[in-house]
């Protein structure tokens, strides 16, 4: 369909995430050196390794981790990218990723964090906000249920980055609100 052809940014993001995941598999051990070199942790940021804010957003610690994030990215990308356009969708994704990184650094500054979950939570929250702005209760849609289920999983399973998920969701909700419902209209 036309909408499926227009999800270029979504496809590129999925390809990058899968590439980085496969690249980290080339190493050995439970936590290989490549994962360690890309992960987010405040001591590394304080040491000037700012690239980790971006690299950690493409790093995944297992097949289930990358698989779930890419499944949600694919579904949310099909919904949001045709509505927002490529540039705004990319901006929403990366703003949410940065929000997730900030949340992770605030709550677990010395932990090693990675994954696209912050960005994906931002996309879920933006979609929920967009539905609400249009008079659709997001809790009566798959988006609302998916967001709630993922938040429950976030708080129920140890080792999941609560700060990353919540930081991404808050950022996505705010940026999504601004993008999906302009508060100012032009008058001539």
Give the positions of each predicted feature.
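A detector for small-residue-rich transmembrane helices and their helix-helix packing motifs
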Residues: 1-188
